[in-house]
């Protein structure tokens, strides 16, 4: 496929993609948000409740060491907005609920629930920074240490209903294999998330971390059952227990738009070697020969392709190309992503995806952003 044909295909796909997303799809939610913001004048009861729940998370405070265990299930209760004031109207364990009416007087409810097994997790990276206070009695600084533990529920569900009908849901399911103190070299974490907002659905399937040597993630964004974007990534490597020594090996990543109308596939054979090659290149950015050699090494580690219109043969090869840049007093070398098409033509990313060539899709995107800003301001 030549560059001209590829550009036409991408123009068509980008416009079709933007045409699938309409700001009016979110009009209902903007009205609900506007009602909630305008009517909620006094949330002092909620603030006091939250502080009480937060205080309940403190397990111990000995020898200036404060140990907290944060549990979603600790934050339960039911609140109703009436006359601009939030009032506590219920207290059922395992559920947090907020009731209010929108501008039309339609009852709306936001509910947070948890279920399933709870797993206690802790890692030193969760802990807060040590604080030092001067003790005038002893003339010395006193160190306060904060340790943060979390109780991770197996299932978390957040729901927005209007007139009893679900309009938005977020469901998070997690599976953790740990003894409590997270060991990044041994433990496994797997999380799946599904969020539904009107006709839109975002699914993150099996975002997984496996025994310090493998990371996986996959996600899709769809509307009315049609997949708008699909993404996946997988990486292999190693990590030590403190996460201060990370090695990256093979990495693959794919992104597809409108069921394969446009797809980018990237494979890196060795992440560490790629990082080293790029570091070396930019440490020699005033030496053309050295810079080119290191970028050539980087390209040998990358296999990146652009596929169009659902075809098995790639439309363009994606690679890094050395480009000379000139400043006021000196010149240096930089690497920019380039596309090489079937007709032999080569374009930098910036030269191919110009505002002029994709002005229709860009205008559609800017209008969408502007409309959403007005809706949710």
Show which residues each predicted segment covers.
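Hydrophilic extracytoplasmic domains
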Residues: 4-29, 41, 237-377
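Extended amphipathic alpha-helical coiled-coil/heptad-repeat regions
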Residues: 172-176, 183-268, 273-274
